[in-house]
């Protein structure tokens, strides 16, 4: 019974989302648990190293013809640049483009690294992603208040609203605005979490199925093909969700800058 429970725990599809401690820092006098080296810390460093390595590899060394790494970076750069320009008009886009581009690259690389089997998904951590989206939302709100002052609150009163409907619409618009802080990150985290959970469950069922006998071993290639198809879809979702997160952040930033 104990061995069965142990196998169930080890093979749990949710185990891939657990934060495990590699190096704990504890003293009898001071609580240093916040400095522990965990899977979250390790994969954050890996993401930063991969992003930095991409820029090193894309260094053209003054060559006329760019390398494939450089071309790939230029495609990503131009895509995000055009997206930010489309959202934020005028000259203001230049101030916020580095932030949106960095945000996109971090989420994109985090999503792609999480597609490696037995790896850790940073963006599937609800606390981290929702905290990130709340910080972005709070920063945009402070920026808008600093730029517009009391006029900022006109954002919650749609133009042309009849006076008797103003209190109701203000409450609705306020709730909608506050919900952005959660929906921005929840959308990303829920998609990555559900996709990885689905692949883990299907992989576990397939592994159990092919171990029954030789006949099921042969038939096991069918669910394996399905898993590979789902994995390809997850790669697409990983890229799309990074772009969606960035474009929504740009859209919210536009609303804060121009109050519409």
Curated annotation (Swiss-Prot):
Main localization, broad class: mitochondrion
GO molecular function, one term: proton-transporting ATP synthase activity, rotational mechanism
Cellular compartments annotated: Mitochondrion inner membrane
Topological category with respect to the lipid bilayer: Multi-pass membrane protein
Propeptide segments, given as residue ranges: 1-11
Keyword tags: ATP synthesis, CF(0), Hydrogen ion transport, Ion transport, Membrane, Mitochondrion, Mitochondrion inner membrane, Transmembrane, Transmembrane helix, Transport
Transmembrane segments: 37-57, 96-116, 126-146, 152-172, 192-212, 217-237
Cellular component aspect of the GO annotation: mitochondrial inner membrane; proton-transporting ATP synthase complex
UniProt keyword DNA repair, yes or no: no
InterPro entries recorded: ATP_synth_F0_asu, ATP_synth_F0_asu_AS, ATP_synth_F0_asu_bact/mt, F0_ATP_A_sf
UniProt keyword annotation of Transport present: yes
GO biological process per UniProt: proton motive force-driven ATP synthesis
Domain of life: Eukaryota
Record note on quaternary structure: F-type ATPases have 2 components, CF(1) - the catalytic core - and CF(0) - the membrane proton channel. CF(1) has five subunits: alpha(3), beta(3), gamma(1), delta(1), epsilon(1). CF(0) has three main subunits: a, b and c.
Entry's family note: Belongs to the ATPase A chain family.
General function of this protein: Mitochondrial membrane ATP synthase (F(1)F(0) ATP synthase or Complex V) produces ATP from ADP in the presence of a proton gradient across the membrane which is generated by electron transport complexes of the respiratory chain. F-type ATPases consist of two structural domains, F(1) - containing the extramembraneous catalytic core and F(0) - containing the membrane proton channel, linked together by a central stalk and a peripheral stalk. During catalysis, ATP synthesis in the catalytic domain of F(1) is coupled via a rotary mechanism of the central stalk subunits to proton translocation.
Protein name (database record): ATP synthase subunit a
Annotated source species: Candida glabrata (strain ATCC 2001 / BCRC 20586 / JCM 3761 / NBRC 0622 / NRRL Y-65 / CBS 138) (Yeast)
